[in-house]
A protein has these predicted regions:
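Alpha-helical scaffold segments in soluble metabolic enzymes
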Residues: 30, 34, 52, 97, ...
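Glycine-rich beta-alpha junction loops
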Residues: 19-23, 43-46
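Alpha-helix-loop-beta-strand connector modules within alpha/beta enzyme cores
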Residues: 1-12
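Glycine-rich phosphate-binding active-site loops on the catalytic face of alpha/beta enzymes
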Residues: 34-52
Length: 113
């Protein structure tokens, strides 16, 4: 409408895709075609971070029940498993992978060269 009314080119208005989390790739690409230049994905990023923590806990549950004692032995320490630096790093990596996917979905890889 705006393009026709004011005799402008394609996509003369930059749009923000509010609530973009959970959108399919085809929906994202369609939105870009309409002039979307920014997409909000905070919910997806929060979930990705939590997903990393969840998966780590599920995978290492027998090492997170006590400080000492696990499937490897009753006197084996578990510190390296419950150390927050370990599971927070896993969460950060999951978060990072979700960011990379968003950049790919939005055709925003190496665009500032």
């Amino acid at each position: 409408y705006v393009s026709k009314k004011f005799n402008l080119g394609k996509n003369p208005i930059d749009f923000v895709f509010h609530g973009g989390s959970g959108s399919s790739l085809s929906e994202i690409r369609e939105a870009i075609g309409y002039g979307v230049v920014k997409m909000n994905i905070d919910t997806d990023l929060q979930f990705a971070f939590t997903e990393g923590v969840r998966d780590y806990i599920v995978e290492n549950i027998d090492f997170l029940k006590t400080q000492i004692g696990n499937p490897n032995g009753l006197s084996e320490p578990n510190k390296k498993f419950y150390d927050p630096r370990k599971w927070l790093r896993i969460a950060e990596e999951s978060f990072n992978q979700r960011l990379i996917k968003a950049f790919e979905d939005l055709n925003n890889i190496n665009t500032l060269n």
